[in-house]
């Protein structure tokens, strides 16, 4: 998300055009490096509810978010939006994107927890190390009872392994690119061949 885990009253002042651009570029680089997606499609969520054409709920989309998306697009980053979070997750639009940039932490985690109740994985982007975690809460009452579901933990381990392999591959390619070979183009038209 654009903001970290901060009090909700501080969210509005933390959302700036520069912050959106910086976080989205970092997110895009992480997707490219750790998931080997060459040109990721990133959805940018709106801050305010839908049907806000008259700015009655706020003008952040018009003044901050849309200009940031336009600047990202001018830099060649596939950023789309802003999308109202309720429609975006409720209608399944999230399946059409490689990543989602939320404006604040709970805007992304609340629908994620609703969609993936048992096997969700937390992936922290932009770190020099790979960090994954099972998106579960400790349930000490079932410790040692052979009742816990380890699926989320297993998915977190597999994601960490895959991301590490992808990052290693990406870094090797970036360090040792193939040299570009330029050949002069020959004119193979009929006129040249029979002259």
Task: Give residue ranges: language-model regions.
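Anion-binding alpha/beta catalytic cores of soluble intermediary-metabolism enzymes, centered on
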Residues: 1-60, 66-195
